[in-house]
C-alpha cells in the first residue's frame, strides 16, 4: 500500500481539512507517515491568503517536487486555497504536480488518488459550497490533549482586503447536532482543550437557523464531560452579544478569552475595509466584556498600511491600542491581493511606511504586554503542560493563551510532569510576552 505524507500550511481551519483527508486515506488502508523522504505520495495542503503565505506554499511545493528526482516520491498532490485560486498557473508552472484539488474537493481525495493511476494530471475544482460533516473520518494531528472543532466554512463578511469568500465560498454553518456529536467523540478520545473555529465563529447558525447560535452551542459544549478548556477563536466584535458574554462567564470550562480581530480603529479605514462596526462600537463592546468579566483576556489582530491610511488614521489606531491595552495583539502590514476591492482602491501606502507602522505598533504592544505581565508576578494560574525542555523545566500555557500564537509559561517542578496535564503555577518572573513560575500542585 502507498505511503502518504501530508504537509498542511496556514490556519487551523486548513488543518482540519488536512485531518479529514488523512482520516479518509487512513480508513482506506493507506499508510500515513511523517518522513517525506520515504513517502510515495506527498499532499501539500496550501494557504493562499496573503503574499507571504502564497510564497511559502509555492516554495514547499517546489522543494517536494525535487523528491521525484532524489527520493521515493511518485505522486505530488496540491490541495487547499492556493490550489483553488491558482489551479491553471500551478498546472503550467510546476508540471511535477500530479493533482490539483480545490477547497470543495478534498473530501474526494481517495477517489482522486485512485484515478491518478490512469490519468497523468488531475484538476478537481468542485463546488466550494461543500461543508464536511461528522460522518467523514478525521485523523487528529494535534497533541492528544487538544483538538480543533470547526463549526462553519466560508465567510460572508466581504471585507475589501480579503480573498477568503472567493476561495471558500459564503458562510455555511454545520448542523448543531453534528457539531455536538463530533465534540462528544473528541471528549471520549481524551481531548481536554477544545478550540472552536470558523472564519467567523460568532456568525454560527445565522444561515441555517435564521439567527446566530454560538451562545447556545457553547452551552451544550460546556456540558460535555471531559473538556477542561473550551476556547473560541475568530469572534467578530459586532456579533459578540451580552448573551454570549454571559455564557462564557457562567461556565468555568469556557475560557474567558476573546479573540476579536478589530483590524483598525479609524472609522475612515474601517469603512474602506467594509467592516461592519465603528471605533466607538468596538470600545463599547470591550467595556461590556470587561465590566462582566474583569479578568477576560482580549486578543486582536490589526492591519496597518491599508490603502488611504493617513498619519491621522494611524495615530487614532495607536491611541486606541494605548487606551484599550489588549492582552494579545498581532499587527500585520497590508498585503495587496488581486481580485479584491481593496486592490482597486487609490492611495496605496509605500512598503517602507507599512513596515515602519507595523513595527511601531508592535513596540507599543510589547510595552503594554510587559506592564500586564509584571502585574501577574506572585499570582497563581492553571497551566497546561506541553513540553519538557530540560531537567525539571517545562513549557505550558494558561487559559489566556492559544496554542502557537500566544505566550508561554516556563514552569519549574521538582517532580516529573506529564505533557497534557494541568498544574497550578505561581508566577515569579515575567518577560515582555512570556512568564516563569514554579509548580504548586497538580490539578485533577
From Swiss-Prot:
Q: One Pfam family, short name please?
A: TRAM_2
Q: Where is the MTTase N-terminal domain?
A: 2-118
Binding locations of [4Fe-4S] cluster 1: 11, 47, 81
Q: Quote the InterPro entries the UniProt record gives.
A: Elp3/MiaA/NifB-like_rSAM, Methylthiotransferase, Methylthiotransferase_CS, Methylthiotransferase_N, Methylthiotransferase_N_sf, NA-bd_OB-fold, Ribosomal_uS12_MeSTrfase_RimO, rSAM
Describe the location of the TRAM domain by residue ranges.
Answer: 374-441
The free-text note explaining how the cofactor binds reads:
Binds 2 [4Fe-4S] clusters. One cluster is coordinated with 3 cysteines and an exchangeable S-adenosyl-L-methionine.
Q: What's the superkingdom here?
A: Bacteria
Catalytic activity, reaction form:
L-aspartate(89)-[ribosomal protein uS12]-hydrogen + (sulfur carrier)-SH + AH2 + 2 S-adenosyl-L-methionine = 3-methylsulfanyl-L-aspartate(89)-[ribosomal protein uS12]-hydrogen + (sulfur carrier)-H + 5'-deoxyadenosine + L-methionine + A + S-adenosyl-L-homocysteine + 2 H(+)
UniProt record, GO biological process: tRNA modification
Q: Which EC numbers does the record give?
A: 2.8.4.4
Keyword Transcription regulation in annotation: no
Residues noted as binding [4Fe-4S] cluster 2 in the record, renumbered to the chain: 155, 159, 162
- Keyword Ligase assigned to the entry: answer is no
Q: Which residues form the Radical SAM core domain?
A: 141-371
Q: Can you cite an annotated GO cellular component?
A: cytosol
Q: Where in the cell is it found?
A: Cytoplasm
Q: Which cofactor does it need?
A: [4Fe-4S] cluster
Keywords recorded for this protein, A-Z: 4Fe-4S, Cytoplasm, Iron, Iron-sulfur, Metal-binding, S-adenosyl-L-methionine, Transferase
PANTHER family listed in its UniProt record = RIBOSOMAL PROTEIN S12 METHYLTHIOTRANSFERASE RIMO, RIBOSOMAL PROTEIN US12 METHYLTHIOTRANSFERASE RIMO
Entry's family note: Belongs to the methylthiotransferase family. RimO subfamily.
Q: State the protein's purpose.
A: Catalyzes the methylthiolation of an aspartic acid residue of ribosomal protein uS12.
Q: Which HAMAP family is this protein grouped with?
A: MTTase_RimO (MF_01865)
**Name assigned to this protein:** Ribosomal protein uS12 methylthiotransferase RimO
Protein's organism: Clostridioides difficile (strain 630)
Amino acid at each position: 500500500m502507498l505511503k502518504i505524507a501530508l504537509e498542511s500550511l496556514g490556519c487551523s481551519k486548513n488543518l482540519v481539512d488536512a485531518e479529514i483527508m488523512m482520516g479518509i486515506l487512513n480508513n482506506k488502508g493507506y499508510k500515513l507517515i511523517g518522513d517525506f523522504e520515504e513517502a510515495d505520495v506527498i499532499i501539500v495542503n496550501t494557504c493562499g491568503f496573503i503574499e507571504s503565505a502564497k510564497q511559502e506554499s509555492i516554495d514547499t511545493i517546489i522543494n517536494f517536487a525535487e523528491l521525484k528526482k532524489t527520493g521515493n516520491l511518485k505522486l505530488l498532490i496540491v490541495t487547499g486555497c492556493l490550489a483553488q485560486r491558482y489551479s491553471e498557473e500551478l498546472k503550467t508552472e510546476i508540471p511535477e504536480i500530479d493533482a490539483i484539488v480545490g477547497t470543495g474537493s478534498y473530501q474526494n481525495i481517495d477517489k482522486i488518488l485512485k484515478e491518478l493511476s490512469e490519468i497523468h494530471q488531475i484538476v478537481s475544482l468542485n463546488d466550494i459550497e461543500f461543508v464536511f460533516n461528522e460522518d467523514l473520518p478525521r485523523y487528529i494531528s494535534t497533541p492528544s490533549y487538544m483538538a480543533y472543532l470547526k463549526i462553519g466554512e466560508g465567510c460572508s463578511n466581504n471585507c475589501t482586503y480579503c480573498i477568503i469568500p472567493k476561495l471558500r465560498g459564503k458562510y455555511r454553518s454545520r448542523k448543531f447536532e453534528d457539531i455536538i456529536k463530533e465534540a462528544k467523540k473528541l471528549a471520549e478520545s481524551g481531548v481536554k482543550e477544545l478550540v472552536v473555529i470558523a472564519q467567523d465563529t460568532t456568525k454560527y447558525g445565522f444561515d441555517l437557523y435564521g439567527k446566530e447560535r454560538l451562545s447556545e452551542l457553547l452551552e451544550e459544549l460546556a456540558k460535555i464531560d471531559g473538556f477542561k478548556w473550551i476556547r473560541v477563536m475568530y469572534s467578530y466584535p459586532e456579533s459578540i452579544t451580552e448573551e454570549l458574554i454571559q455564557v462564557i462567564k457562567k461556565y468555568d470550562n469556557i475560557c474567558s478569552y476573546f479573540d476579536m480581530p478589530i483590524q483598525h480603529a479609524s472609522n475612515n479605514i474601517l469603512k474602506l475595509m467594509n467592516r461592519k462596526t465603528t471605533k466607538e462600537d468596538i470600545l463599547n463592546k470591550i467595556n461590556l466584556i470587561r465590566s462582566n468579566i474583569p479578568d477576560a483576556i482580549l486578543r486582536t489582530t490589526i492591519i496597518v498600511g491599508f490603502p488611504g491610511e493617513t498619519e491621522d488614521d494611524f495615530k487614532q489606531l495607536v491611541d486606541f491600542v494605548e487606551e484599550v491595552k489588549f492582552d494579545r495583539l498581532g499587527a500585520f502590514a497590508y498585503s495587496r491581493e488581486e481580485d479584491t476591492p481593496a486592490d482597486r482602491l487609490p492611495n496605496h501606502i509605500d512598503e517602507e511606511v507599512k513596515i515602519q507602522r507595523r513595527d511601531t505598533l508592535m513596540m507599543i504592544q510589547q510595552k503594554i504586554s510587559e506592564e500586564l505581565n509584571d502585574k501577574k508576578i506572585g499570582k497563581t494560574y492553571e497551566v497546561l503542560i506541553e513540553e519538557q525542555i530540560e531537567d525539571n523545566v517545562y513549557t505550558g500555557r494558561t487559559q489566556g493563551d492559544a496554542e502557537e500564537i500566544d505566550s508561554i509559561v516556563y514552569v519549574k517542578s521538582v517532580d516529573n510532569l506529564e505533557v497534557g496535564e494541568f498544574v497550578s503555577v505561581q508566577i515569579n518572573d515575567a518577560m515582555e510576552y512570556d512568564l516563569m513560575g514554579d509548580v504548586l500542585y497538580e490539578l485533577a
